């Protein structure tokens, strides 16, 4: 719970909640918002992973602006406990649905259960936490919800169908959400990053694990995708750029729905939109043949 002394300290601060704050975009965004004097409720599934965040916050003298809270967005018991925690808070200004991971493999060989797990975190987790905070924002007639999507929510890549489909779903849900809550003074925005140097790119290892069968008919295709991911490691963007963009959206008086960010992301979205599908398909498949 937020203790009485902490409540006094947060009285004149904007309060932000961010899921998946133990690393990557979540950790960096927590620190950047704290620098802007937000009181940040930094949630994570495993509290043992808070060490890096707390260490960096202490070095920057930001610990007074950060409250680490356990939250597994896929576990109803954890969500219920988080709801009890929220009962001690008088307002919520920003929600950043950042918790997520990427699963890969080829559709024929991926168990349906893997798709369910992917959606539980990347989509249903965001829905669950959003449902918790909406009554606060609606009552105060203000608030901002920032959903961390991906270029994979706009472009379907082979070998990544669980992740791609979960992000496409997040995009459609966010569009509906924005139209539903806009009349209550609540904004919804989607951030669509390209490839960045975060641990979400453990997907490369996941791909290898899912496709380790040397007799798989997709083995050669998988090897090419694996090579593409590995070759891209040297060109991954700086995740601080994404954290800064999230803060920019949080601070903006007005927001649009979608914010693509990253090398080549806007161009790729534009090209896919204007090209006939047959030409787009030809270019994508040809790019893999050249590997």
Predicted regions and their residues:
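Substrate-binding pocket helix/loop in short-chain dehydrogenase/reductase
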Residues: 106-107, 114-116
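Conserved glycine-rich Rossmann-like NAD(P)H-binding loop of the short-chain dehydrogenase/reductase
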Residues: 36-52
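Residue(s) in the substrate-gating loop at a strand-loop-helix junction
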Residues: 150
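Active-site helix of classical SDR
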Residues: 130, 166
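Conserved glycine-rich cofactor-binding loop
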Residues: 15, 22-24
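The beta1-alpha1 cofactor-binding region of Rossmann-like NAD(H)/NADP(H)-dependent oxidoreductases
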Residues: 70-81, 112
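C-terminal beta-strand-loop-alpha-helix "lid" module of Rossmann-like NAD(P)-dependent dehydrogenases
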Residues: 182-233
């Amino acid at each position: 719970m937020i203790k009485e002394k902490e409540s006094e300290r947060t009285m004149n601060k904007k309060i932000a909640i961010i899921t998946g704050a133990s690393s990557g975009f979540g950790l960096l965004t927590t620190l950047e918002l704290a620098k802007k004097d937000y009181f940040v409720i930094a949630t994570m599934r495993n509290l043992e992973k808070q060490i890096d965040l707390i260490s960096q916050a202490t070095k920057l003298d930001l610990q007074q602006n950060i409250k680490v809270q356990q939250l597994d967005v896929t576990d109803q018991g954890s969500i219920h406990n988080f709801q009890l925690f929220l009962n001690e808070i008088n307002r919520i200004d920003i929600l950043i649905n950042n918790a997520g991971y990427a699963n890969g493999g080829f559709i024929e060989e991926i168990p349906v259960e893997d798709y369910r797990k992917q959606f539980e975190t990347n989509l249903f987790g965001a829905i669950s936490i959003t449902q918790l905070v909406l009554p606060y924002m609606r009552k105060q007639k203000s608030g901002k919800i920032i959903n961390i999507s991906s270029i994979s929510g706009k472009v379907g890549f082979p070998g990544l169908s669980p992740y791609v489909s979960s992000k496409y779903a997040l995009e459609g849900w966010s569009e509906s959400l924005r139209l539903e809550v806009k009349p209550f003074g609540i904004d919804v925005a989607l951030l669509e990053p390209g490839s960045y140097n975060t641990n979400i790119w453990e997907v490369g290892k996941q791909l290898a694990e899912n496709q380790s069968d040397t007799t798989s008919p997709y083995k050669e295709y998988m090897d090419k995708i694996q090579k593409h991911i590995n070759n891209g490691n040297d060109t991954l963007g700086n995740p601080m750029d994404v954290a800064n963009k999230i803060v920019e959206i949080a601070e903006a008086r007005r927001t649009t729905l979608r914010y693509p960010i990253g090398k080549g992301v806007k161009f790729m979205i534009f090209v896919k939109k204007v090209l006939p599908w047959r030409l787009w398909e030809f270019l994508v498949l040809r790019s893999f043949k050249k590997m």
